[in-house]
């Protein structure tokens, strides 16, 4: 016969665990909302910067631009900037981005290209340090949503390596946010930049809302079309000098948006994982409660039979 006390203790433990996972789910949901607000707050600057760069690129499209950040050279060494999380309990978020980085490194190695890593997030740092790969620098994720200051520190580091010639190309590997239950590791070339190839497309803002007591994501399409500078606009400085000054800002902005999107993906993955854990805990607690009731009923029935048997013996 099952041990009633053991079943009761296990049910209590599972219910306590469910309280923890539910609290973690709500915390992750609140942080996703803050991440959303942060992205929306930085959008005006990003849109204006894209407009200025787009206008300058259009103005200078027939000129030869001899700017360091635009110079493409033979790739002998590629820097892989990998963004992961600091903690676990977020499903396959960290595993997927690390696997994508390893896959890309193998592809480059097969082409005879050396790889050096710049790592963001403790999970990627711990993983690649154990494998003793060449690491240029490591950064912890901030406790809150990444800011422009955080992105600027990393951007300055990779920019210095690119300008010094120790890195010929920088590729960013991060997780693109698709929905609360879906994200995808992607690769984006950060350096060298190409203003002639600046694409300005419609963007989407992901808003975390609630409906029927459940969290869901609504999508809002934002027009990102830009207007060209007037043809008669006069620059006090040489447009090439202006472009040279704005390109580092554009690099930092690109990194910031990817970092914020990775952070939102991690939080959404954690929220989903904790939601699934809470559901599983409820289901397991229900199954154990049923088993407990059956065992208790069997024990009572056995006691009644023993009493009746004893009475008949008298």
Curated annotation (Swiss-Prot):
Entry annotated with the keyword Nucleotide-binding: no
SUPFAM superfamilies reported in the protein's UniProt record: ATP synthase (F1-ATPase), gamma subunit (SSF52943)
One Pfam family per UniProt: ATP-synt
Topological relation to the membrane, as annotated: Peripheral membrane protein
Keyword Transport found: yes
GO MF: ATP binding; proton-transporting ATP synthase activity, rotational mechanism
Entry's Gene Ontology cellular component terms: plasma membrane-derived thylakoid membrane; proton-transporting ATP synthase complex
Any coiled-coil regions, as ranges: none
Subcellular localization(s) per the UniProt record: Cellular thylakoid membrane
UniProt keyword annotations, A-Z: ATP synthesis, CF(1), Hydrogen ion transport, Ion transport, Membrane, Thylakoid, Transport
Primary location recorded for the protein, binned into one broad class: membrane
CDD domains: F1-ATPase_gamma (cd12151)
PROSITE patterns per the UniProt record, alphabetical: ATPASE_GAMMA
InterPro entries associated with the record: ATP_synth_F1_ATPase_gsu, ATP_synth_F1_gsu, ATP_synth_F1_gsu_CS
PANTHER family named in the record: ATP SYNTHASE GAMMA CHAIN (PTHR11693), ATP SYNTHASE GAMMA CHAIN, CHLOROPLASTIC (PTHR11693:SF41)
NCBIfam families noted in UniProt: ATPsyn_F1gamma, PRK05621.1-2
Subunit and partners: F-type ATPases have 2 components, CF(1) - the catalytic core - and CF(0) - the membrane proton channel. CF(1) has five subunits: alpha(3), beta(3), gamma(1), delta(1), epsilon(1). CF(0) has three main subunits: a, b and c.
Function (record text): Produces ATP from ADP in the presence of a proton gradient across the membrane. The gamma chain is believed to be important in regulating ATPase activity and the flow of protons through the CF(0) complex.
Similarity field: Belongs to the ATPase gamma chain family.
The name this protein goes by in its record: ATP synthase gamma chain
Species whose genome carries this gene: Trichodesmium erythraeum (strain IMS101)
Taxonomic lineage: Bacteria, Bacillati, Cyanobacteriota, Cyanophyceae, Oscillatoriophycideae
